[in-house]
Amino acid sequence: MTLHAYLGRAGTGKSTKMLTEIKQKMKADPLGDPIILIAPTQSTFQLEQAFVNDPELNGSLRTEVLHFERLSHRIFQEVGSYSEQKLSKAATEMMIYNIVQEQQKYLKLYQSQAKYYGFSEKLTEQIQDFKKYAVTPEHLEHFIADKNMQTRTKNKLEDIALIYREFEQRIQNEFITGEDSLQYFIDCMPKSEWLKRADIYIDGFHNFSTIEYLIIKGLIKYAKSVTIILTTDGNHDQFSLFRKPSEVLRHIEEIANELNISIERQYFNQLYRFNNQDLKHLEQEFDVLQINRVACQGHINILESATMREEINEIARRIIVDIRDKQLRYQDIAILYRDESYAYLFDSILPLYNIPYNIDTKRSMTHHPVMEMIRSLIEVIQSNWQVNPMLRLLKTDVLTASYLKSAYLVDLLENFVLERGIYGKRWLDDELFNVEHFSKMGRKAHKLTEDERNTFEQVVKLKKDVIDKILHFEKQMSQAETVKDFATAFYESMEYFELPNQLMTERDELDLNGNHEKAEEIDQIWNGLIQILDDLVLVFGDEPMSMERFLEVFDIGLEQLEFVMIPQTLDQVSIGTMDLAKVDNKQHVFLVGMNDGTMPQPVTASSLITDEEKKYFEQQANVELSPTSDILQMDEAFVCYIAMTRARQDVTFSYSLMGSSGDDKEISPFLNQIQSLFNQLEITNIPQYHEVNPLSLMQHAKQTKITLFEALRAWLYDEIVADSWLDAYQVIRDSDHLNQGLDYLMSALTFDNETVKLGETLSKDLYGKEINASVSRFEGYQQCPFKHYASHGLKLNERTKYELQNFDLGDIFHSVLKYISERINGDFKQLDLKKIRQLTNEALEEILPKVQFNLLNSSAYYRYLSRRIGAIVETTLSALKYQGTYSKFMPKHFETSFRRKPRTNDELIAQTLTTTQGIPINIRGQIDRIDTYTKNDTSFVNIIDYKSSEGSATLDLTKVYYGMQMQMMTYMDIVLQNKQRLGLTDIVKPGGLLYFHVHEPRIKFKSWSDIDEDKLEQDLIKKFKLSGLVNADQTVIDALDIRLEPKFTSDIVPVGLNKDGSLSKRGSQVADEATIYKFIQHNKENFIETASNIMDGHTEVAPLKYKQKLPCAFCSYQSVCHVDGMIDSKRYRTVDETINPIEAIQNININDEFGGEQ
């Protein structure tokens, strides 16, 4: 038994010496005693290639490259293995989760956390950590019993010890964990004759766990020889760069002392790896205190990018340069990263440059459609058929793959389900999914066409097929009692779904099309699923378990599944993390993401046991645990050192100034340290570099076209652009090989989001030969022509959801107030509190069930909202009573409809207008309330409009003037046209155009002492004060509020009097009768102008900006019009907001309709 240690800094030939030594032994005696090379898992393939690719060897029967676990299996093959079943990672996790749930009531600290999946994962990691460092439950229990400690720490350790002991008891004599198998391996070593003849080499490690040190001790004791290779200069200082490997050397020395053998050290001081002085100087001077600056020869580069995406694009371009100009192969290049955000960027950017690569990392299977289907299926059962997991299940397209356009059918089903509030067992109600119900989806009245009917029948059939599969699954699972029964039921359900055949067919198609990686994913998905089922049966067998617990445990197992992808080719760029990737002797290594916070990154304790608790336990129990965060923090420089010394020829460091979430980032302090080692090592700012060297952007044909587009766009905006881009454009344009897609890019240069004006025929096809429209439609056009085109031309509708919208609330208030008003004939002043409550309850019972398929009775929240609506109605009726008490105007008509041809005697006639093209304009709508007052054979009318939103309960005469607010003038015009149908006198004049805000007022007080019941009632009444415009006629003023007198301001209408009895300018919103008529006439002209523009085919993305606000903020069509302030601001429309609308309207002439031209 001999022990050798090869010690030296990076690149000094330690591993080369080891490989040479092994190869010499193999050549001398190919069938001699075994040679074992122990390396980390991620290094074994690379080392095997070193032997396979040697032309003098072409492989080996004598040498094996193994990691510790594989070595243990090799010994077990010789001496016999354990009788227990080995637990996989997933099986261990599932068992511990189940134990935690069973023992939850006995936990002291973690009782509330036990129900969360993440807790069992943390607990599993902690138990595995204890096993790696040979800490048993007995160690924990003795420590807890013997030591005085904080209550929280004691409770924590007791909880962990409880689960740990229970776990050990469960697996005793039946199962074995990976860590326990290594202990068994140690016990088997003395029996192995093969091991006694073996030469052992250990390379690629920088630290070991306690159990691994015990294995090394056994190897030293029983093998013929052991050689360990460590990257260290032998300095044992805890602040040394090589603290971590020097700690390993110290442990090896202790083992040697215990075994009473000496270590034959061989120091390697000569640098062999690096081909130039730059890399040699970087390695030698990285950790020195006194810096020796030398001139940089260009083999070290530091790149600064604005964003991470720009950073990886530049790395891709430089890889192409290495391949094309330096004749490197892809396998000569490596990229090392630390920030996980870069993994996504590699997948999205490198394929654009046709760069083959392999990322040495495991990806979770949880987001694969098959796995998402299974997990959603589980959640459907767990959640009692809630809508979200059901929709996720449908959208995976796994159970619906047999349907043509299945994604479209699922989208239609989703729309219907969200509109009708389908959840729970309502999914099983076939009546709810009657095809006729789909006709009303998003539309109040619509008859299905034959194509639509066929489509919706397919939707219903698809839904039924999926429901049948879920019901079969639920039935099979509900009949099971033991875990084995559940696993069997699950597998049989998958066969019932025909999932195995479906997956194998898809796998074969992918293989046939050359997509081998995706095909391999399907294989691994299915094998992983079967493995989890096998693990469940192995661990729990015939143990009784509830279906709920089984599905929880099963889901825990699925969480552990990961893809392990084999490289698809040998010649590819190696990508890995700086901490784990094993890339040696690459010609060029790129270290990306070299930012402060990433390199070095702050190390924080993430285990259940804190660093302080860990240190206390180590000191008091005389054991060693995994390194604490402060120790790991000291090793950050070593991580950087190892990463940057992997290259032979060139090292490129890069960093970005902005993170993936838009946060600012700083350069790594290690880069400042590296820069200080060299003269003339400047940081290259990528945008500035490309500005000076535009040709450096032209490395890949497809990406060059994209960059060319950006350059030409800058040129169009009169920015200075290098002539090289104009030359590049001509070359690409004239090359049949390169110009594919160029026309499309060029068309984007002049894109300004401009719509096409509709022709006369198309306008009539879209809008009809006459315009039948509400006032709001015209107001919508004034907001933005494209909004009108999208809503009434293309008839685009937002998806209706089973939730109360603002307009629903307004409809409810209108319906309730109409119901009550008709019951009392508009005489609000007769109401008392008891009558208000009675009528409110009656109205709500009648109206609420009709809202959104009885939405307001669907949940506790909506039932609470119903009560709130009732409270608002009661408060509103109290205000209406107050207003009716002091007004001579009487409410006479409620929710009165108007149209060109009334359907009943109660409806009003709307005069037809005509566009400039001769197309009729038929306006329709509904007036909330019409109040009347008659004196001396003259009738005065008030238009009252209920608004549930404060913002819309204001009459802005400037908006009225410009046609942005047309409602009130239109309603007054309709009433004045229908005096006979309303039963009014021959002479009818406007009274007021008023808004009533339906709401629940909030009164603010500075302190409790300010609260006075009388004042509170007054303040509440003021919150319901009508707003709008009132006829300045004295008869109207007197009738609106009978209390009006000098120095009095009404609290029910916008009218106030000065001391002399004149109208107050501050407290009054009034206009004379002629002015009101002029506004009405101008409103008609606005209708004609707007309708004419519609029929002219205007569809511009041209929102009307008013008071610095755009209607786009509340528009649902932004995803269609793509309005962009950078492109469309020149088309924003504005109006002169400084005008006095009452003065401006005086230029309008009034025709005979209002009593002669004025």
From Swiss-Prot:
Summary of subunit composition and partner proteins: Heterodimer of AddA and AddB.
Protein name: ATP-dependent helicase/deoxyribonuclease subunit B
Alphabetical list of PROSITE patterns matching this protein: UVRD_HELICASE_ATP_BIND (PS51198), UVRD_HELICASE_CTER (PS51217)
Record organism: Staphylococcus aureus (strain MW2)
GO MF annotation list: 4 iron, 4 sulfur cluster binding; 5'-3' exonuclease activity; ATP binding; double-stranded DNA binding; helicase activity; metal ion binding
Sequence ranges assigned to domain UvrD-like helicase C-terminal in this UniProt record: 269-583
Keyword Ribonucleoprotein annotated: no
Positions annotated to bind [4Fe-4S] cluster: 784, 1112, 1115, 1121
